[in-house]
Amino acid sequence: MIDLIARKRPPAGLRPALRASLSAAMQHFGGEEREVTVVLVGDPEIRALKLEHWGEDAATDVLSFPTWEPGDPFMPPHLGDIIISLDTAQRQAESRGHSLTREVALLASHGLTHLVGHDHPHAEGLGFEEGATGEDWQVFHDAWAAAQTGLPAGA
């Protein structure tokens, strides 16, 4: 189940596309019976969260808050929360030449990958969708490939 909370209004069509793509990524991880909360916000909100939890005073595209840690004896029904800044996502979509819907789906798949227990090295600003490679990144590429299968044509 995907609980979608919009604290910043997304454009028409984004919500169903996000649900479909994230559902495909959850199925990829075998987590279709799990729950995830996605919160769509603006830069001020995500900046405040990043400052509070990571000590960095800057907006970002996506933050993940898992409810469990790898190595815990079981995975709970609710995997955690994914927070996405629609402001940052819009800028990134424009610079990458694709839609906001596609960018938000990409960010959600990235956040989900963190929620199921995977991490990646910091890539000096290079995002996984921009060519970051290596074993640690492959799981993120695979999640995005799965998420894309749920996107509507032209998204």
Swiss-Prot record:
Cofactor notes: Binds 1 zinc ion.
Q: What residue ranges are annotated as transmembrane?
A: none
Q: In the record, what terms sit under GO molecular function?
A: metalloendopeptidase activity; RNA endonuclease activity; zinc ion binding
Q: What's the EC number here? A: 3.1.-.-
Localization, per the record, is:
Cytoplasm
Q: Where does Zn(2+) bind?
A: H110, H114, H120
**Cofactor(s) in the UniProt record:** Zn(2+)
Of the GO CC terms on this record, one is:
cytoplasm
Q: Which GO terms describe its biological process?
A: rRNA processing
**Which key words are in the record?**
Cytoplasm, Endonuclease, Hydrolase, Metal-binding, Nuclease, Ribosome biogenesis, rRNA processing, Zinc
Q: Does the keyword rRNA processing apply?
A: yes
Q: Which Gene3D superfamilies match?
A: Metalloproteases ('zincins'), catalytic domain (3.40.390.30)
PROSITE patterns documented for this protein: UPF0054
Main subcellular location: cytoplasm
InterPro entries membership: MetalPrtase_cat_dom_sf_prd, YbeY, YbeY_CS
Question: What this chain does, per the record?
Answer: Single strand-specific metallo-endoribonuclease involved in late-stage 70S ribosome quality control and in maturation of the 3' terminus of the 16S rRNA.
Q: Which family does it belong to?
A: Belongs to the endoribonuclease YbeY family.
Q: Record's HAMAP family? A: Endoribonucl_YbeY (MF_00009)
What is the protein's name according to its record?
Endoribonuclease YbeY
